[in-house]
Amino acid sequence: MAKVSELYDVTWEEMRDKMRKWREENSRNSEQIVEVGEELISEYASKLGDDIWIIYEQVMIAALDYGRDDLALFCLQELRRQFPGSHRVKRLTGMRFEAMERYDDAIQLYDRILQEDPTNTAARKRKIAIRKAQGKNVEAIRELNEYLEQFVGDQEAWHELAELYINEHDYAKAAFCLEELMMTNPYNHLYCQQYAEVKYTQGGLENLELSRKYFAQALKLNNRNMRALFGLYMSASHIASNPKASAKTKKDNMKYASWAASQINKAYQFAGRSKKETKYSLKAVEDMLETLQITQS
């Protein structure tokens, strides 16, 4: 097999810089990382200086993802020799156990890390990932709640907990998690959109009104969010047909739904009428508008 350096006519410095760029971008292009990284550590290890250790870690994680356990084990052994007793290296050992589906061994290892260092967030998150991989959502939820009691500012954990509650159809708790996220990220249109979707799923006039409000907020933050635009149409339409809504509320929401449908129509027209799938989409939007006109008349 041709070497990367020969195939693409690149120097080892350029390969090292590419690996750094992938780390900074948190790229999960495991095959490329393995190809470039394996050549770096086998041919140029002596030239890499202290960069060699972070590259070993990067290559090991990619190798696990790519199914190269031989390479992952080699990198792990090099790291163990250099950093015996390191919690970071122990966590990598646990990740290898996970890749081998030795989940009990991985959890025992993470528990030992946490006994020595209760603030080790990486080990806690790996335990949660295992529970999810095993389909044990209830245990993952419990672990995440315990984690958030200590690390309340971890936004990624709040979002993960919201997703787990949604999977368990516990929409009230999912909404609470998303409210926490919106308080710290008021300009994130995706959080507004997801919160609106949860309230829409909960149903009832009050939740539908909240849903419409947050779909509108998501659109205000990003006017190209088509999912929020469809959500605005759906929530406003349901409010307009809700028997508990007042006449004024019904009339107002009919206007909102009509506006949303017209915006959807414009978006599809802008995408071009030549595409077959676009024509079907346009027909669906036109049917929406026709339904609104019938309801209004």
UniProtKB/Swiss-Prot annotation:
The N-acetylalanine modification is found at: A2
Any Gene Ontology biological process = protein insertion into ER membrane by stop-transfer membrane-anchor sequence
Record Pfam families: TPR_EMC2
Q: How does it sit in the membrane?
A: Peripheral membrane protein
Q: Which PROSITE patterns match?
A: TPR, TPR_REGION
What residues bear N6-acetyllysine in this entry?
K255
Any coiled-coil regions, as ranges? none
Extent of the TPR repeats: 87-120, 155-188, 192-225
Q: Which UniProt keywords apply?
A: Acetylation, Endoplasmic reticulum, Membrane, Repeat, TPR repeat
* Function description: Part of the endoplasmic reticulum membrane protein complex (EMC) that enables the energy-independent insertion into endoplasmic reticulum membranes of newly synthesized membrane proteins. Preferentially accommodates proteins with transmembrane domains that are weakly hydrophobic or contain destabilizing features such as charged and aromatic residues. Involved in the cotranslational insertion of multi-pass membrane proteins in which stop-transfer membrane-anchor sequences become ER membrane spanning helices.
Homology family: Belongs to the EMC2 family.
The name on file for this protein is ER membrane protein complex subunit 2
